[in-house]
């Protein structure tokens, strides 16, 4: 399962760890992903999405119905 938020599209990004001596070693910054069940009133069922914390805030703001409509237009399975 890929580490991508289904709502915002956030993915891992790369950067450097920096020691006290400023030596650089490669690392990945991972999104804060959670599998979360959302109740969809119109369909009378739960939908499980893999979303970041920011994605949950977007769902709180726009509503699950609007977000699911956006996912459908992108052709993403949920």
Swiss-Prot record:
Q: Which SUPFAM superfamilies match?
A: L28p-like (SSF143800)
The answer to whether the entry has keyword DNA repair is no
Q: Which UniProt keywords apply?
A: Ribonucleoprotein, Ribosomal protein
Q: According to the UniProt entry, where is the signal peptide? A: none
GO BP field: translation
Cysteine pairings via disulfide bonds: none
Tell me which domain of life the UniProt entry assigns to the organism this sequence originates from. Bacteria
GO CC terms for this protein? cytosolic large ribosomal subunit
Whether Ribonucleoprotein counts among this entry's keywords is yes
Of which family is this protein a member? Belongs to the bacterial ribosomal protein bL28 family.
What protein is this chain from?
Large ribosomal subunit protein bL28
Query: What organism is listed for this UniProt entry?
Result: Erwinia tasmaniensis (strain DSM 17950 / CFBP 7177 / CIP 109463 / NCPPB 4357 / Et1/99)
């Amino acid at each position: 399962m890929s580490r991508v938020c289904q709502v915002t599209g956030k993915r891992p990004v790369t950067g450097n760890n920096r020691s006290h001596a400023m030596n650089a070693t490669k690392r990945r910054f991972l999104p804060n992903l959670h599998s979360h069940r959302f109740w969809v009133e119109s369909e009378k069922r739960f939908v499980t999405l893999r979303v970041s914390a920011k994605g949950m805030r977007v769902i709180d703001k726009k509503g699950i119905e609007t977000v699911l409509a956006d996912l459908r237009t992108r052709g993403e399975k949920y």
